Design a protein with these regions (language model features):
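Binding-interface segments
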Residues: 16-226
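Glycine- and charge-rich intrinsically disordered segments
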Residues: 1-27, 230-302
């Protein structure tokens, strides 16, 4: 018991601020970011000091930030590209707060457009009366644009679509009922027996945003062009990076924190895509997992 208390006290004394003062961390940040390293470090410190993240395990904050940096995506929740989100994850018999990297749906669109192969890409809500029919075999949707009785107060489904420059196009549609089943199946918080946990889930507070990301991720992971950046995003989305291995914390029995996204931005150059931080996964040396069946985005949907 005494050893456990001592270990907890030692962990509290280690912060992001103390870690980045070490020469090894400074050197790696400088190698990764060059002249932008000081700005990145300053932004990361601001993120680490947010009320929702200040008690999170510091290495998990750093590794999550580096994932966002390698993808050249800002982590301001108001922009909707990527997020650093705190979670209570069970380690042994204890719950420890760690930071988790999460993609936003705009981040997926951004990575897709960077390939230069997409002519059009979008994901939207579908309102009552908008659709005539859905072809289950091809995925094609026929919209009824002339229907004067379209009810834009009622969302009945979600659709994601892209068309490549070579002419290939694909559509994926999920009804609201299908999305509800999906959310309850893969989100521990949304399916929790505790009412306050359910209400705190973004599936409750921003169902449409969460659903848009889900259908877009399903489209891109199954039919899109999987660039190295896209593979990394899909693999690391909703994961805590432990020694280079993504750990999907929503697969554990845990209750997510109510307030779970920061509002700070980190801007990183697109060419800064390689790092030797042990917490970051090298996607070229690992098999890319099909993560669309992992629990969906528990940070803000936008």
């Amino acid at each position: 018991m005494a050893n456990q208390v001592q270990r907890q006290e030692q962990q509290r004394s280690i912060t992001v601020n103390t870690l980045i003062k070490q020469d090894s961390y400074k050197k790696r940040f400088n190698e990764l970011l060059g002249k932008k390293a000081p700005g990145f470090i300053s932004s990361m410190l601001n993120v680490a000091n947010l009320p929702t993240l200040k008690d999170a395990e510091p290495n998990s904050i750093i590794s999550s930030a580096v994932v966002a940096a390698t993808l050249d995506l800002p982590i301001d929740q108001n922009l909707g590209f990527a997020y650093i989100v705190p979670y209570n994850t069970k380690v042994g018999n204890e719950y420890i707060k760690k930071a988790q990297f999460q993609m936003g749906y705009k981040g997926y669109i951004q990575l897709a457009m960077r390939t230069g192969q997409y002519k059009t890409i979008n994901a939207i809500e579908v309102y009552e009366g908008e659709i005539k029919r859905v072809n289950r075999l091809t995925g094609e949707i026929e919209f009824d644009y002339d229907n004067e009785f379209i009810n834009r107060e009622i969302v009945v489904g979600y659709v994601a679509y892209f068309k490549l420059l070579n002419g290939f196009e694909k559509t994926v549609y999920m009804s609201k009922e299908e999305m509800e089943i999906h959310a309850k199946k893969y989100s521990q918080s949304y399916s929790s027996s505790k009412d306050w946990v359910v209400k705190g889930s973004l599936w409750s507070t921003d169902f449409d945003g969460m659903a848009i990301k889900t259908v877009l991720k399903r489209l891109l992971s199954k039919y899109g062009i999987l660039s190295i950046e896209m593979q990394s995003a899909i693999t690391n989305d909703q994961a805590v990076i432990n020694d280079g291995t993504p750990e999907y914390v929503d697969n554990q029995v845990r209750e997510e924190l109510l307030q779970n996204a920061n509002k700070k931005t980190i801007g990183i150059p697109v060419d800064a895509v390689e790092t030797e931080f042990k917490e970051v996964k090298d996607v070229e040396n690992n098999n890319i997992q099909e993560t669309i069946d992992q629990p969906m985005f528990e940070g803000p949907g936008f």
